[in-house]
């Protein structure tokens, strides 16, 4: 009698990754950029936006934004309970900027000065809420638009006639000032998205960022964004 053939080891099992996102921008990023770079033949990505409110009478569901942790927790648990096999995972993509105070680890991490250690504290706290090896918590430093600062030249190609030389110089100066673009802070008027909007008046938070990133080398984004790269590396190793 011949040796039993292990089809599982011979066939590349496609991994399913549910990504709980803050809003439409992140969903578009997953569908249009992240999936392409991870590989359509290796992964099936399922981005899901946080449900913020539901009007049962009107039959409407409202999505996007993170006002409190309870809504996030509800959606994460819903997906976790739906996982039926070991080839399915769940991760998150929330901006550090604007996280609610009741988010796990937020209060405890405020005394930590090193931003990477602070984010690690928050992610660990989020992970401990579920104690599931298939759950990979990720918080974006400081917000989604940080990724756009990885290549201002690509941004110029998309918005070349919508920002003057002074505006472009301000963006270049921002990179020089911080050196590490993941450190561009989360102030009300100084977060990455606010800096972009100040220089590019037509910048739209939902659509413009995706336009710019589609023209940017994904490898360059990973090189410029240490924490983001660590997340991608984790997903690639599944």
Please report, for each region that a protein language model flagged, where it lies by residue.
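Non-catalytic terminal and connector segments of soluble metabolic enzymes
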Residues: 63-69
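Catalytic nucleophile-elbow at a beta strand-turn-alpha helix junction centered on a G-D-S/GDSL motif
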Residues: 18-28
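C-terminal accessory helical subdomains adjacent to catalytic cores in phosphodiester-
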Residues: 1-13, 27-59, 73-238
């Amino acid at each position: 009698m011949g040796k039993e053939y292990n089809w599982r080891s011979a066939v590349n099992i496609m991994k399913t990754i549910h990504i709980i996102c803050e809003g439409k921008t992140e969903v578009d990023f997953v569908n249009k950029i992240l999936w392409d770079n991870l590989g359509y033949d290796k992964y099936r990505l399922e981005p899901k936006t946080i449900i913020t409110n539901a009007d049962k009478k009107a039959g409407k569901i409202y999505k996007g934004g993170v006002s409190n942790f309870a809504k996030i927790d509800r959606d994460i648990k819903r997906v976790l309970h739906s996982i039926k096999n070991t080839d399915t995972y769940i991760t998150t993509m929330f901006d550090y900027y604007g996280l609610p105070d009741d988010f796990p680890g937020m209060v405890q991490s405020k005394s930590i000065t090193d931003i990477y250690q602070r984010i690690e504290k928050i992610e660990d706290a989020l992970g401990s809420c579920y104690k599931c090896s298939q759950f990979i918590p990720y918080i974006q430093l400081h917000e989604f638009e940080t990724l756009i600062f990885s290549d201002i030249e690509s941004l110029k190609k998309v918005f070349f006639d919508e920002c003057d030389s002074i505006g472009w110089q301000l963006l270049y100066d921002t990179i020089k000032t911080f050196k590490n673009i993941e450190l561009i802070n989360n102030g009300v008027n100084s977060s990455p998205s606010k800096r972009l909007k100040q220089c590019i008046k037509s910048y739209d938070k939902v659509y413009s960022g995706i336009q710019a990133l589609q023209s940017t080398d994904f490898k360059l984004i990973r090189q410029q964004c240490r924490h983001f790269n660590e997340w991608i590396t984790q997903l690639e190793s599944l």
